[in-house]
């Protein structure tokens, strides 16, 4: 909303909802290999501004938004406690389709990098989830990696769960809104962060 206000656009609920829809659409296209990451950053604002019939610069908005994102983060209730618990029992790796500058900035400001043995950012690797190339690249950088003892945990069916399926590892879907999985089926799912340690201990 700060970015929209800067360009004198009222960040009312309908506008923010439409931006969210457009943003998700662009990331889906990236996952499908139809557009580039730079196009994701730009197109979400280009389409929104076109629909709002404003002359605001999509290029300037995209740059400003990325800068703000890099310094913004929030924890879900129990998130850092969960990381501490898992860190004491498992090897943790972070896999993300986010942009390099945003993800590194967020991780630094959140102070959670220490919990991960390695962090795999798609822009850095040159491949995106859910492609098998992305996961093959990640696996090649993990010492003593074994698919049978590995799982991917994520909230996106199309990038995290489909990616795990493509890569041949078990999948755990974080589904707090109790959505129904239809075409992409995870091996396990949970709806609350506090339930994850027990689930992991049973599989």
Regions found by a protein language model. Name each.
Residues 1-77:
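N-terminal helical cap/lid subdomain that shapes the substrate entry/recognition surface
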Residues 9, 54, 88, 144-145:
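Short, well-ordered coil loops that connect the C-terminus of an alpha-helix to the N-terminus
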Residues 78-89:
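Catalytic-core regions built around general acid/base machinery
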Residues 84, 100-203:
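Asp-based, Mg2+/Mn2+-dependent phosphohydrolase catalytic module
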Residues 89-90, 168:
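Glycine-centered short loops/turns at secondary-structure junctions
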Residues 93:
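Conserved serine/cysteine hydrolase catalytic core
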Residues 96:
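Conserved phosphate-coupling serine/threonine residues in phosphotransfer and NTP-handling enzymes
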């Amino acid at each position: 909303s700060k970015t929209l206000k800067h360009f004198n656009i009222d960040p009312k609920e309908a506008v923010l909802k439409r931006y969210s829809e457009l943003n998700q659409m662009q990331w889906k296209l990236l996952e499908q290999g139809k557009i580039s990451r730079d196009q994701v950053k730009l197109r979400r604002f280009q389409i929104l501004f076109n629909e709002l019939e404003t002359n605001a610069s999509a290029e300037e908005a995209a740059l400003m938004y990325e800068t703000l994102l890099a310094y913004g983060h929030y924890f879900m209730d129990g998130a850092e406690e969960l990381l501490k618990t898992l860190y004491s029992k498992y090897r943790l790796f972070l896999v993300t389709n986010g942009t390099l500058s945003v993800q590194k900035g967020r991780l630094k400001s959140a102070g959670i990098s220490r919990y991960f043995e390695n962090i795999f950012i798609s822009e850095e690797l040159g491949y995106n989830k859910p492609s098998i190339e992305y996961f093959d690249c990640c696996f090649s950088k993990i010492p003593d990696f074994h698919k049978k003892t590995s799982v991917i945990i994520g909230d996106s069916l199309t990038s995290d769960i489909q990616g795990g399926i493509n890569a041949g590892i078990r999948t755990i879907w974080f589904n707090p809104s109790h959505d129904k999985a239809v075409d992409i089926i995870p091996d396990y799912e949970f709806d609350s962060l506090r339930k994850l340690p027990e689930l992991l201990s049973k599989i």
